[in-house]
From Swiss-Prot:
Gene3D superfamilies reported for this sequence: 3.30.160.20, 3.30.70.1660, 6.10.140.1950
Molecular function terms from GO: translation release factor activity, codon specific
UniProt KW keywords: Cytoplasm, Methylation, Protein biosynthesis
Modified residues (N5-methylglutamine): 236
HAMAP family the UniProt entry points to: Rel_fac_1
Post-translational modification note: Methylated by PrmC. Methylation increases the termination efficiency of RF1.
Gene: prfA
Name of this protein: Peptide chain release factor 1
Length: 359
């Protein structure tokens, strides 16, 4: 099937989806309605671009016809030639764009995410850097108009982040932040370093798509839920009523503790949201590992222990090791202006996929 047949098939399916989504039987089936709505949303941009492309093709035909019929009218002929030139340039741009739009879509791209950041090797300095990463993502979320909610956090004695779990909600969050999973390395002189030596520390980032209950159902028999009193600083109990929740997925051993909220139900709901995402992600990673060669051919789906980026403070440098990108803009990037890095990762990923399709 050539590209034009593929595009026509996408448009035909889009029109079919419009009819299905107005079918009362589909509307009453929540899971199916959500799946079809997501499919329609995922194909809308491609269909819009294809329809615009077809109009450009028509414009080329009209301009060529106008040149033939100019009959010595120099002004009309010149206008038609200019129209033809612009339309041919637009045709080339649309063809490149449509190739990218036809690439297989990541079904999670439009989803919200659960973001986890942990201080790793480097003690207090790693925890402080984890805090810097948290601030970077919070500020980036602001620039995108996303909602950023810290669901659970644990700090150390110097104000660094031992672990933080956040929900980031908005348009196409996963499509932009999915490349952030991995080990982030920092090189800088710690505040406590009297000799001025540069230390190296790491923090790890995990990005998981939010998973709705209708998408992934966890058998309640597989969960152990413990209720206990929330603890404050110094370990004292801060609630007379037990509101904190510890939830364990028995088959995988995945555990979530939640005590940020004032009520047991709210803590339970948040814990369930996180554990559903972690369990779904756990099995998704197993499936990806079984397709190891394919997984390694793309950026953003590699080994999560892999060092993906270095932040060098003395040189104001950020290097993304996966794509060989180096920017002397560390202060800018940590202030939340991440577009240059993220756009480069998206472009690299698309290029790799296009090359794989053309082989």
């Amino acid at each position: 099937m050539n590209i034009y047949d593929q595009l026509q098939a996408v448009e035909d399916r889009y029109e079919e989806l419009g009819e299905l989504l107005s079918d009362p039987d589909v509307v009453s089936d929540t899971k199916r309605f959500m799946e079809l709505s997501r499919e329609e949303a995922n194909t809308r941009e491609t269909v819009t671009a294809y329809r615009e492309y077809k109009q450009v093709i028509q414009n080329i035909s009209d301009a060529e016809e106008m040149i033939k019929d100019a009959s010595g009218d120099a002004e009309l002929e010149e206008m038609a030639k200019e129209e033809l030139k612009e339309s041919k340039a637009a045709k080339e741009e649309y063809e490149e764009r449509l190739k990218i739009l036809l690439l297989p879509k990541d079904p999670n791209d439009d989803k919200n995410i659960i973001l986890e950041i942990r201080g790793a090797a480097g003690g207090d300095e790693a925890a402080l850097f984890a805090g810097d990463l948290l601030t970077m993502y919070q500020k980036y979320a602001e620039t995108q108009g996303w909602r950023f909610e810290v669901m659970e956090s644990s700090v150390n004695g110097v104000g660094g982040i031992k672990e933080v779990v956040a929900m980031v909600s908005g348009q196409s969050v996963y499509s932009k932040l999915k490349y952030e999973s991995g080990a982030h390395r920092v090189q800088r002189v710690p505040v406590t370093e009297s000799q001025g030596r540069v230390h190296t520390s790491t923090a790890t980032v995990l990005v998981m798509p939010e998973v709705e209950e209708v998408e992934y159902e966890i058998d309640q028999k597989d969960l152990r839920v413990d209720i206990y009193h929330a603890s404050g600083a110094g370990g004292q109990n801060v609630n007379k009523v037990a509101t904190a929740v510890r939830m364990v997925h028995i088959p995988t051993g995945i555990k979530v503790e939640m005590q940020e909220e004032r009520t047991q139900q709210k803590n339970r709901d948040k814990a369930m949201k996180i554990i559903r995402a972690r369990v779904a992600d756990h099995f998704a990673q197993i499936a990806q590992d079984e397709q190891d060669a394919e997984r390694k051919s793309t950026v953003g789906t590699g080994d999560r222990s892999e060092r993906i980026r270095t932040y060098n403070f003395p040189q104001n440098r950020v290097t993304d090791h996966r794509i060989g990108l180096t920017l002397q803009k560390l202060d800018t990037i940590l202030s939340g202006k991440m577009d240059e890095v993220i756009d480069a990762l998206v472009m690299y990923d698309q290029t790799q996929k296009l090359e794989a399709l053309n082989k």
